[in-house]
A protein has these predicted regions:
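Residue-level recognition of oxygen-bearing side chains
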Residues: 15
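Short, disulfide-bonded extracellular cysteine-rich repeat modules
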Residues: 50-54
Length: 444
């Protein structure tokens, strides 16, 4: 159980803070606060809580969740809300934003490598190999120390990609996002992510989740080598924050003992140097930079937040297709490409070697396509390479009429044909799918 410090009885000796093994004890506005998400009762470090032992007045007491309303009297004015039409909002959609979204959603499934300094790096060539984008992950937004172990990448939360997209949307509201900041608080983020409807989650749990996701989205460092394109001169960016976490304001309420309870968070964030080249309105008019943006559906954020545990593959595909569909009405995406995005290269390799893994992956893939269809991302199958015989059953029965008489006629005609809707899949379906394509996906 976490501990808390009643400031009314605290003498301010500061003996406890250096003794805390998790760094949970913090000084906010000359008053002590123990972060309940970091405090673990010194379990795994010491047999007893060190703050209790170090305190001359035995002030620390067990923490209990705050009861009643969480109200913040004074807050800084935040940036205007996104999604003013209730449906969508412009967002920065440059290749650097797309690849960062891939990194946060696909994580260890991507081909990470070790650079010359021994740090983990995700690198992607651009413009037919003439340029490159490289990402490093730091231990925190406040640290410049890059991670060196893949285990750190595996701890990333796919939901951090939603925060990344929200930041990309806020960046489009500024004229010079690489110099200007936007301010967003936990109430706005709860609304965008659908967390305000989660009555099963306490305020403290929501604040902890939002803070962790913001920290992860702001832990990316990007380097870009971009070749000359027409009038646009080539440029190079080395080790720049993708999103700079300028400030985190914590809002507290105190009880009658002086115990501080975290009830709100406000974040000040600024886009990195990349925005000067990919989200520059004035320079775009002068044809010396890009201004690349797309449309972010609000429903995509809430859908990813609701399906990420049971259908991570579908969530990955939704985030990837958000950018892919921007490239044109017809994408002609191969099934292996979709599987690589949804499950990673290693799982596909296992499926190619093992029959049971192959069957399992096929079922998962077809179910994930159904989830996408249910949430408005409808797929158009290529009739040549992806005929009805190898399409998922849900896609084949979608044309069954709802009218009973018409449905009866449909089944009579189906039964008298050479192939039936309920026929089992042909032998070698996996090999057929490896050459199949989906012509397009629609965004919700």
């Amino acid at each position: 159980m976490p501990y808390t410090i009643p400031n009314n009885s605290c003498v301010g000796c500061d003996n406890c803070r250096p003794q805390c093994p998790t760094g949970a004890i913090k000084l906010e506005n000359d008053k002590y606060w123990i972060d309940p998400c970091l405090c673990n009762n010194c379990e795994g470090y010491y047999p007893e809580p060190q703050c209790v032992i170090a305190c001359p007045t035995n002030s620390p007491i067990p923490w209990h969740a705050k009861r009643g309303r969480c109200k913040v009297d004074l807050r800084e004015v935040t940036s205007p809300d996104l999604f003013s039409n209730g449906k969508s909002n412009p967002f920065a959609s440059a290749i650097v934003i797309w690849e960062a979204c891939n990194l946060l959603s696909q994580r260890a499934s991507l081909p990470w490598e070790t650079d010359e300094q021994g740090n983990l790096c995700y690198r992607r060539q651009v413009n037919q190999g003439k340029g490159a984008i490289a990402f490093h992950l730091t231990t925190s937004p406040q640290s410049s120390e890059p991670v060196t172990q893949l285990a750190a990448v595996e701890t990333l939360d796919i939901r951090a990609a939603c925060l990344h997209l929200i930041f990309a949307a806020y960046a489009t509201t500024l004229d010079q996002p690489w110099e200007q900041e936007f301010t967003v608080d936990e109430r706005q983020l709860e609304k965008y992510l659908g967390l305000e409807k989660r009555k099963d989650l306490s305020k403290n749990v929501k604040l902890t989740l939002i803070n962790n996701l913001v920290q992860q989205a702001c832990s990316l460092v990007v380097s870009i080598d971009w070749p000359q394109q027409g009038m646009l001169k080539g440029f190079s960016i080395k080790g720049s924050r993708l999103w700079e976490l300028v400030q985190v304001q914590r809002h507290f309420q105190e009880d009658n003992l002086g115990c501080k309870y975290l009830v709100g968070l406000t974040f000040k964030i600024r886009a990195g140097v990349w925005a000067q080249y990919f989200l520059n309105k004035q320079a775009c008019k002068e044809r010396t930079a890009f201004y690349q943006y797309g449309s972010l559906p609000k429903s995509l954020l809430t859908t990813v937040m609701s399906i990420w545990q049971q259908h991570e593959g579908a969530a990955r595909l939704m985030l990837w297709l958000l950018f892919k569909t921007k490239m044109g009405a017809s994408q002609r995406i191969t099934v292996p490409t979709l599987m690589r995005v949804a499950y990673g290269e290693e799982k596909i390799a296992q499926a190619c070697r093992q029959r049971e893994e192959r069957k399992r992956l096929l079922r998962t893939f077809e179910h994930d396509l159904e989830v996408l269809n249910h949430h408005g991302m409808k797929s158009v199958f290529d009739p040549v390479t992806y005929p009805p015989t190898i399409q998922p059953l849900w896609a084949r029965i979608v044309d069954i009429p709802e009218d009973p008489d018409e449905a009866l006629e449909f089944w009579i005609n189906d039964g008298s044909g050479t192939s039936r809707l309920t026929d089992v899949s042909p032998r070698g379906k996996w090999n057929l799918l490896m050459n199949a394509r989906i012509l397009s996906f629609s965004l919700p």
